[in-house]
Amino acid sequence: SNVLGKRTTTKDEELLSNLLNSKTVLACYNTTDPKITLAQSKDFDSYKLYLADTGLFTTMLFNDKSEVYSDIYIKLMGDKLDANLGYLYENLIAQELAAAGHDLYYHTWQKPNSTHYYEIDFLLSQKTKLVPIEVKSSSVQYHDSITEFAKKYSDRTGEQYLLSQKDV
């Protein structure tokens, strides 16, 4: 799989299946051709995994030394932690979307004349429109992916959400 950066084996697929069935992780699949029915172009080989319990994830991240844990947690809750926590915020949004009953999808596509890609962190389907969601850990000044997505799929894009640490 793309997650591991190598070809998957039957054992890898079995382990992933066990994790998903245990409900300890959430899978977010790439949709290669986003339409209202996102599942139609679901790429089973391209996915991101999120921990289903963000509180547990936070504890695992910052519980290196018990004496500094409370200080880190206070800084985290007060938005004063000097760290790039994009993965933590993204995990929180994944957990909330899944709890609301949404299947998790994201979308990537190559930037023109580049080896880099645009990525929409989460993509929902609501009625006849797609709803892109971008999660930023710091500056919301740069949001090329959501802007380009809205241009590329203007006929099917509805509301767009750009979430930052100030929103979470």
Where is each model-derived feature located?
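A cross-kingdom feature that marks ATP-driven nucleic-acid transaction machinery
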Residues: 14-17, 21-168
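Conserved helicase/translocase motor-coupling segment
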Residues: 1-18
